[in-house]
């Protein structure tokens, strides 16, 4: 049963990556009795909400597609506002109140890392579609990602600039207050 749920979570996360432009309201569908609850955490409001809304909509679309083929899952998502403390509080609500069996999210690296550590302690399967910090999956064997890491992206950009564009030097402009920007710049 756990492997089947993990397969659904992985499929939903992969479809989320392909469908991030779809629109929906981002709320949970609790209308199906007996449905297996899959949790979601994403910044649905705030500065990075564009990423959370897109990912959340893709996950909901994937769950809907899976259910259209005879399965019975429900997606319960909460807005963590791009904040690690909010993410932990929402995660605890998903586990305690909503009784989720797996988690898709978080979307950005700081909240994702905080939740990953707790999910590992709780033996909760978790996958992030977009959390790129290396430390996320180092939280444990229950934590997965469906995207490239910061170092990989930075190295690929540097390789492209050097090998394809012929650049011998580069000036890197980055935001020192943003972990994603720092991670890419350091690897470049």
At which residue positions do the language-model features occur?
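Short, low-complexity disordered leader/linker segments with a strong preference
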Residues: 1-37, 67-69, 121
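Beta-alpha junction/loop-to-helix N-cap segments that form part of ligand/metal-binding clefts
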Residues: 26-30, 51-55, 65-136, 146
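Short beta-strand segments enriched in small/hydrophobic residues
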Residues: 34-56, 106, 169-175
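Short, solvent-exposed amphipathic alpha-helices that sit
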Residues: 51-66, 86, 126, 153-156, ...
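Amphipathic, non-transmembrane alpha-helical secondary structure
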Residues: 60, 85-96, 113, 155-163, ...
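Glycine-rich, charge-decorated loop segments at or immediately adjacent to ligand/cofactor-binding or catalytic sites
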Residues: 137-141
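An alpha-beta-alpha
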Residues: 143-188
